[in-house]
């Protein structure tokens, strides 16, 4: 049977995600970000809730991406996630895209010209942001001309690179409805951005997602809920360059601005430059918030939930993969667990995120109905 992998954040889970799961074939394995997102922000609702949303709408198995895979630039995010999916026996990668590029051809180009392409990246001016360098690389070697500002394009190309190195087939699905960052109130296929922005509009949320009651009744957070803690971390840390990926230039810019801003958005606006994108600055601020340092990615895979079909698939791979289903005496990843502890501080009603939690079990798979 086909085992389809999907890399996701589900922040929050919406009708577009449900559509993607409906288009996917076979056993559907989701590699999902934990409580902090790829672009450097806390999830609006916690990872367990988002995993439940997915399992109630077609997913068979949801595993958690470690913190230092979740909160990364597109290439590292995709590479880390796809390598984990490959270990779980995934042979097909499904992802949404705004434009149906010839991803198979693009993957072949990368396989055949990987060294040249990586060398091209390294030669690009340091004044360019990483997305700008990546765009130039794809333009040079694959003739792809696009703005480079569409996250699903950038991620789609990153997935293509990662899948080509793991022998995984690609299954791009045309994205339905609103664009990735659209805040418009398109009711059927609203974007995650729009649902977060208009979360107080119950009618809109109910139209835009299949699990609206679960979402609306769950404790929610935004970046600003952590601003006081972030400010404390910045002002009291003796050397911010000890934090993961924070260099002296960025450390100085953050230190010099933190006293004069009242929101995370203001701080990001003050610190970001052409070279250091807002997404990169948010990731760095997330690292500072968590007090993250460079750490090895855990070999074990943490399971957030499954259907009966997903549980059977886990049993078929457990001899070759170290699986963690309960964190207690058995630890997993200390940095992810620290991130979970910080995440809980954003809302007193958030349930325990680590200790003693067991996978959510969806008794009936949507594909069996």
From Swiss-Prot:
Its EC number is 6.3.4.-. GO terms for biological process: tRNA modification. It is found in: Cytoplasm. It catalyses: cytidine(34) in elongator tRNA(Met) + acetate + ATP = N(4)-acetylcytidine(34) in elongator tRNA(Met) + AMP + diphosphate. It is an enzyme of class 6 (ligase). The keyword ATP-binding applies. One of its GO terms (cellular component) is cytoplasm. SUPFAM superfamilies: Nucleotidylyl transferase. Pfam families: HIGH_NTase1. The keyword Cytoplasm applies. Keywords: ATP-binding, Cytoplasm, Ligase, Nucleotide-binding, RNA-binding, tRNA processing, tRNA-binding. ATP binds at residues 7-20, 96, 152, 175. GO terms for molecular function: ATP binding; ligase activity, forming carbon-nitrogen bonds; tRNA binding. It comes from the Bacteria. Belongs to the TmcAL family. Catalyzes the formation of N(4)-acetylcytidine (ac(4)C) at the wobble position of elongator tRNA(Met), using acetate and ATP as substrates. First activates an acetate ion to form acetyladenylate (Ac-AMP) and then transfers the acetyl group to tRNA to form ac(4)C34. This is tRNA(Met) cytidine acetate ligase. It comes from Streptococcus agalactiae serotype III (strain NEM316). The gene is tmcAL.
